[in-house]
Design a protein with these regions (language model features):
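Basic, Lys/Arg-enriched alpha-helical interface segments
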Residues: 1-74, 82-86, 93-141
Length: 141
């Protein structure tokens, strides 16, 4: 009788942008630990990670753009690149800026993602028409 093989998760290399690194550097130890936990979950689960931990940003030109919900208003915008590695694009706290945060940050995240794809020799093939950058939970309201 053949032994059942255990499936192991593919090894993913987490990538970060300078924008993300600068933001992360300004956080206290407790928030950095929360961000590290979110990144670990993203890397372990992969592109299928969904709610309540992550949600797709609808209306973005980058189909793969998602947000991770770290705590209350803290969000990470990320995407999986053409090599299926998670790219942490930027982070921020949208507390008190609920409607203004997304349009500004989504545009920046799109640019950072396209820059990343070019840097690894890929031309992003995941562009759609620009929208306003809303999560699925916002669209259902």
């Amino acid at each position: 009788m053949a032994k059942a093989r255990r499936r192991t998760a593919p090894r993913r290399e987490v990538r970060t942008t300078g924008e993300f690194e600068r933001w992360l550097g300004g956080l206290d130890a407790e928030r950095k630990a929360a961000v590290a936990g979110a990144i670990g979950r993203i890397a372990h689960v992969g592109p299928t990670l969904g709610r309540p931990h992550a949600d797709v940003i609808h209306g973005s030109r980058v189909r793969k753009l998602k947000e991770a919900r770290v705590d209350r208003g803290m969000r990470l915008l990320f995407a999986f690149d053409s090599n299926r590695n998670p790219v942490m694009l930027l982070g921020g706290d949208k507390t008190g800026k609920w409607t203004r945060w997304y349009p500004q940050k989504v545009r920046l995240a799109e640019r950072l993602y396209l820059d990343h794809e070019r840097s690894i020799g890929k031309e992003a093939q995941c562009l759609t028409q620009r929208g306003v950058g809303r999560t699925s939970s916002q669209m259902s309201r």
